Swiss-Prot record:
There is a cross-link at residue 166 (Glycyl lysine isopeptide (Lys-Gly) (interchain with G-Cter in ubiquitin)). InterPro entries: 26S_Psome_Rpn2 (IPR016642), ARM-like (IPR011989), ARM-type_fold (IPR016024), Proteasome/cyclosome_rpt (IPR002015), PSMD1_RPN2_N (IPR048570), RPN2_C (IPR040623). The modification Phosphoserine is found at residue 896. Residues 965-987 have a biased composition (Low complexity). Signal peptide: none annotated. The gene is RPN2A. One of its GO terms (cellular component) is endoplasmic reticulum. The keyword Oxidoreductase does not apply. This is 26S proteasome non-ATPase regulatory subunit 1 homolog A. Component of the 19S regulatory particle (RP/PA700) base subcomplex of the 26S proteasome. The 26S proteasome is composed of a core protease (CP), known as the 20S proteasome, capped at one or both ends by the 19S regulatory particle (RP/PA700). The RP/PA700 complex is composed of at least 17 different subunits in two subcomplexes, the base and the lid, which form the portions proximal and distal to the 20S proteolytic core, respectively. It holds the Pfam family HEAT_2. The keyword Repeat applies. Keywords: Acetylation, Isopeptide bond, Phosphoprotein, Proteasome, Repeat, Ubl conjugation. GO terms for biological process: regulation of protein catabolic process.
Length: 1004
């Protein structure tokens, strides 16, 4: 008999008023099954059903059934709070495993409610009553996820609900614990907003990692770095270094390189100093050797060099185990101090330099001599274009032109050498010697070039200043000239970045208190650089002085300095940010925008974004509005795709300052990504009606397009041509021209071998890079700060290293067309008149003579029966002849079609074999593959950066790469040739420091 169709719930609802409990139970059971269909009708009787739930004489099961029914009715009515409240009353009848919209919606609501209560309890430090029934539902849900094998879902809920016990359970029970832990680290960086809670999660992960039979030490050390626990890292490194297994030592060296990539100088030095020295007898030997080498010690040499020599003597004096440890310790200390990676980067950038001097020549010729802004911009562009390559050919060839720089332009020109020679730690002092203050204050040279030289020393030793700090302090103390103080303050801030050195702080503070506008501005920035991320009490001292002084320059320097002190502190900086953003002085509010940007840098924190957007549209000062928009770039660089979307409306603002801020925000957060949306947003701004907006858009576009080839995005070629047009246009305004010149430098930065990277591969902020871009963005007020962009440059290189930290030759594959990632063609920027002069008249007699000579040469070659390999040389020679006289007589044209036919059918290969060390741009990383029969295997799979290699055929002799180095004896002419062709100048071991180029001075 078929079940009759129910057309109304009226009868069942009437039964609810019956006195007998069995009838009520029957009605509730059936209504529960029909509620999806008849909830509008049932909703009229909700008070009756509620009274049944509240009736304590009623059976528990029946009360729970009533609660479930009411919950479903409220769900359909859209009253989710009431629905959840009754669902909790339904107890086990609310089945978390049921696959229905009702259950999914209420579970989400329950988890949100529970998570917000747990967060509130922790953040307010107060007891918050949490309904045990709510907790029970969440726990049932977590248990179900774990039992169903949905570990990632369980971990997400556990992290959100601050249930670290359940998080640990989910990780341990998962089938791939290592993978689950990696996922968890990513989640904690991406989704955990509060810093303290993120630390709790990472501490738990370290605990779980350490319980594993074979811990992933690379990940553990990254977590410990986030937690700022140098002792933990030092213990792991010591354990690996003392291991008898060579692979463990390689792993320790790889960990050290990975930590160095995050650029946290104070942490790295702390780890280095905690690594225990070898046994006592070895230490005594060390001291003896140190006393003998002391007289020969180079005053500019880094402190670490003193540790390296004695380590070699220890090897012979201790037992083999300790000797091995001592040798490995020397290597790892060199890495942690940053020397090894800086040295290798310097050699890579020198040997692979592909900068195009023709571009600079074009800029120089098109810039009017009277225009000092464009003259300086050309010097900046040259420094950026050759950052870290040690190639100063352009300056040597144009000394007369360079000598036209006066006053602050001379300061900038000298400081530019610091960018070109960045990382030349051992020869930094000797390179800058001709310009440095001689014999105390006012040694006879120009104070501008002396100040610039001190700033240059800071740029050379940025974030690695152990060997130069004392010299800079002495220079600062021994002068009262504000220009020299300006350079010395910036140099000290750079070299002691983030070390919070009290003595240096006091020296800089005494300069600040002289109340000199020029020196005070640099002192304010320097204090910030020194105290980066310390969130120190000294910030309030700086703020108090900013209120006292009358100089805008000093207030601006201090405002930025205060912002730097709260770098990465997130909600810990909220009080200071509140204080600054409410200040009456617009310059301090401007500093407040930077404080917001840096405190929440790379977090994509909604609260910070909301505040910045609010100031961007509501502040009365254009400076503050511009900076508020620009600051979005810093908050969002970990999620660059978001930035163009968030600032797209602001980029169309009526206010040019807001448009400029939007351009630079995109430039900062999307730097080096070549993101299509970013380029589309910037394109209209490069032809804006306001000159400074065009300038900002051109610079931002270059930042986005750095290391992007024309083959991967045709707009890169269009942009290069646009820059050339602006530079060559006599009627273009100075602001745009300056933007175009700087953009040309950024586009080809570091000899076309560096990109701008704000995150390391382990998703840690690169402190130096973020700080560099923050100070660089101040160039609006002070052009010499442009050089800070060099701190954000990161080499696009794969540098494989063996156990001895040498660079062996080994091949690997880039599984993509070579044209996608090749260097730009060197002829991209022809000189203005070349195209017109190319067609030249050629006499027919000379054509015939050449043809005759060619024929004779070929016959002679056949007669001598030359060997096979020489034939292509002759062919290529004849090809050259054809190319150079392309439009000559008939006899030459006979060869042409054949040559064209030969070349035409060659298809481009689908892959490319690269040789270590190789240029690998970020977009190329996903195509990097190792060859199957390779002699070397990386300790960790990494497509770029410094990678330690395990040698599978140790008995075979090794061939080493990266032996090109600058020579000190090369004349300017040979230097030019070597730079243009990238030919090796002299062979040297990888451990040797490249020689400094010839010293030169330009007349004032």
């Amino acid at each position: 008999m078929a079940t009759p169709m129910v057309s109304s719930a009226g009868g069942l609802l009437a039964m609810l008023n019956e006195p007998h409990p069995v009838l009520k139970l029957h009605a509730l059971s059936n209504l529960n099954n029909l509620v999806d269909q008849f909830w509008p009708e049932i909703s009229t009787s909700v008070p009756i059903i509620e009274s049944l739930y509240e009736d304590e004489e009623f059976d528990l099961h029946q009360r729970q059934l009533a609660a479930l029914l009411v919950s479903k009715v409220f769900y359909y009515l859209g009253e989710l709070n009431d629905s959840l409240s009754y669902a909790l009353g339904a107890g086990p009848l609310f089945d978390v495993s049921e696959d229905s919209d009702y259950v999914h919606t209420l579970l989400a609501k329950a988890i949100d409610e529970y998570a917000s209560l747990r967060s509130k309890a922790v953040e307010s430090n107060e007891m918050v009553d949490i309904d045990p029934r709510l907790e029970a539902i969440v726990e049932r849900m977590l248990g179900k996820c774990i039992s169903d094998g949905k570990y990632q879902q369980a971990m997400g809920i556990a992290i959100e609900c601050r249930r670290l016990d359940k998080l640990e359970e989910a990780i341990i029970k998962s089938d791939n614990v290592q993978g689950t832990l990696s996922y968890c680290i990513n989640v904690s960086h991406s989704f955990v907003n509060r810093r303290e809670y993120r630390h709790e999660v990472l501490s738990l992960l370290v605990k779980v990692y350490q319980k594993l039979p074979s811990p992933d030490y690379l990940s553990i050390c990254q977590c410990l770095m986030f937690l700022d626990e140098p002792q933990g890292v030092a213990s792991i490194l010591e354990k690996l270094l003392r291991s008898e297994n060579k692979d463990d030592a390689l792993l320790a060296l790889q960990i050290a390189f990975d930590l160095v990539e995050n650029e946290h100088q104070a942490f790295l030095l702390s780890v280095r100093d905690r690594l225990p020295a070898p046994k006592t007898r070895a230490v005594e030997a060390t001291q003896a050797v140190e006393t003998t080498i002391a007289p020969n010690e180079n005053p500019s040499g880094d402190v670490q060099m003193a540790d390296e020599t004695p380590a070699q003597t220890i090897v012979h004096e201790t037992d083999p185990v300790d000797a091995t440890y001592a040798e490995r310790l020397t290597k790892i200390k060199g890495i942690l101090s940053g020397e090894t990676s800086i040295q290798l980067t310097l050699q890579f950038l020198y040997s692979h330099n592909k900068s195009d001097l023709l571009i600079l020549k074009t800029i120089k010729q098109s810039v009017e001599m009277r225009n000092s802004v464009c003259h300086s911009a050309t010097i900046y562009a040259n420094a950026i274009m050759h950052a870290g390559t040690t190639v100063d050919t352009f300056l040597r060839e144009n000394l007369d032109w360079l000598s036209r720089a006066t006053n602050w332009a001379k300061f900038s020109a000298t400081a530019g050498l610091g960018v070109i020679h960045r990382g030349h730690l051992q020869q930094g002092r000797s390179l800058m010697a001709p310009y440095l203050p001689q014999g105390g204050a006012g040694g006879g040279g120009s104070p501008y070039s002396e100040g610039g030289a001190l700033y240059a020393l800071g740029l050379i030793h940025a974030n690695h200043g152990e060997g130069i700090k004392q010299f800079l302090r002495d220079s600062l103390r021994s002068t009262n000239v504000e220009v020299i103080q300006h350079g010395a303050c910036l140099g000290l801030g750079l070299s002691a970045l983030g070390t919070a050195d009290e003595e240096i702080y006091d020296d800089v503070k005494s300069v600040l208190y002289t109340d000199s506008a020029v020196a005070g501005e640099a002192a304010g920035i320097s204090m910030g650089l020194l105290l980066v991320g310390t969130a120190t009490e000294k910030a309030s001292e700086m703020l108090a002085y900013a209120h006292e002084t009358q100089h805008e320059k000093i207030i601006r320097g201090l405002a930025l300095g205060i912002a730097l002190t709260v770098y990465g502190r997130e909600e810990g900086a909220d009080t200071l940010i509140e204080q600054m953003t409410r200040d009456q002085d617009p310059i301090i509010r401007y500093g407040g925008m930077y404080a917001l940007a840096l405190a929440y840098s790379g977090t994509a924190n909604n609260k910070a974004i909301r505040q910045l957007l609010h100031f961007a549209v509501s502040d009365v000062s254009d400076d503050v509005r511009r900076t508020a928009v620009l600051a979005l770039g810093f908050v969002l660089y970990s999620d660059p795709e978001q930035t163009p979307r968030i600032v797209s409306l602001l980029s169309e603002s009526y206010n040019p300052h807001v448009r400029y801020g939007a351009a630079l925000a995109v430039g900062i957060s999307c730097a080096g990504t070549g993101l299509s949306e970013a380029i589309s947003l910037l394109e209209p701004l490069t032809s804006d009606v306001v000159d400074f907006v065009r300038q900002g858009a051109l610079i931002a576009m270059a930042m986005v397009m750095v290391q992007i080839s024309e083959a991967s995005d045709s707009r890169v070629g269009v942009f290069r041509r646009q820059l050339e047009k602006i530079i060559l246009d006599k009627h273009e305004d100075t602001m745009s021209k300056m933007g175009a010149i700087l953009a040309s430098g950024i586009l080809d930065a570091g000899g076309r071998n560096v990109t701008i990277r704000l995150l390391s591969k382990t998703k840690h902020d690169k402190v130096t890079a973020v700080i560099g871009l923050a100070v660089f963005s101040q160039f609006w007020y002070w052009y010499p700060l442009i050089y800070f962009i060099s701190l954000a440059f990161s080499p696009t290189a794969f540098i494989g290293l063996n156990y001895d930290l040498k660079v062996p030759k080994f091949e690997f594959m880039s599984h993509a067309k070579p044209s996608l990632f090749e260097y730009p063609k060197p002829t991209t920027v022809p000189t203005a008149n070349t195209a017109v002069k190319l067609p030249t008249a050629v006499l027919s007699t000379s054509v015939k003579a050449k043809a005759r000579a060619k024929k004779e040469a070929e016959q002679k070659a056949i007669a001598e029966k030359t060997s096979g390999p020489e034939k292509p040389v002759n062919e290529s020679g004849s090809g050259k002849g054809k190319a150079s006289t392309e439009k000559e007589g008939d006899s030459m044209q006979v060869d042409s079609p054949a040559a064209v036919e030969k070349k035409a059918p060659e298809p481009e290969p689908a892959f490319e074999i690269l040789v270590n060390p190789a240029r690998v741009v970020p977009a190329q990383e996903k195509y990097i593959k190792l060859l199957d029969d390779s002699r070397y295997v990386p300790v960790k799979l990494a497509p770029s950066g410094f990678v330690l290699l395990k040698d599978l055929r140790e008995h075979e002799p090794e061939v080493l790469s990266l032996t090109d180095a600058p020579t000190s004896t090369a004349s300017p002419a040979t230097g030019t040739a070597a730079a243009a062709q990238g030919t090796p100048a002299s062979a040297m071991a990888v451990d040797d420091e490249p020689q400094p180029p010839q010293a030169f001075e330009y007349a004032s």
